[in-house]
Amino acid sequence: MMSTYFSAPLSLPTASVPAFIALAGPEESAREGLSGEAQLGLDKVFEADGALSGQAQMLLAPIRKDSTPLTQFAVSPRYASSGVRRQCSFIAPGQSTILSSLKEPETTQVYLAETHDVPQIVAEFSTFPSLKNRFDGPKRVPIEFIDAANSGDALTAHDILLEELQKSKKRSSFTRLVREKNWEYAVWTSWMRSPQGYHVHRSYTVLSVPWAAYLVSARTLPESYLTQPSNAPNLAHASGPAGDLEKCTRTELWAKLAPFVVP
């Protein structure tokens, strides 16, 4: 049984989360670069004298230690509210920091978790286990679908995907499940921190229905809690033409993701 919370989570405006992560930098420069708006969103992490609160210091410690965080993004018409979920894991020995927005996109919960629980937290982020491996989906999806999904527009992405699938006369469980809005588009991204900021190391994009999962060849990434320099490549290790799908069993997928969650 997981013992996730060490203390009550810190609730922050999602827009202020990148600024909170930046506070893990050198103390003398951590607050200098924050805009007035970001500082307003982070008022609860500072004491009256301007020092970081004890809770903030505990949450920032794993962020400071982990130079290869993992971000997760998922969009599905099945999700409540905006249809979008976001999560970021900074994995360190003993305790890790999780930043998570699963229900209300404008708010992010930041909490400490036992590091040995992180693989389960990462796995439970996605609601589609894809146990049956019944592969009868298309060979590719429109780039417009990828763009809509990456922007968090679940309804537009759904319409584009369904329209494309309905062009085929072939019956498939994949098309039926998509028609029922039983699909999920998820992106797992491993980052590397450098003095210039965070850079994408490796990313996997997956389109899944309850019966099957497919790796998506994508050239773009959704917005996340981490940003990389504007002159850096947008995505590393993409394979095949954009939009191509590759069958992927649950075992194969977790073999690819396992290195992301090993501290």
State each model region's role.
Residues 1-263:
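Short, surface-exposed polybasic-aromatic patches that bind anionic ligands, especially phosphate groups
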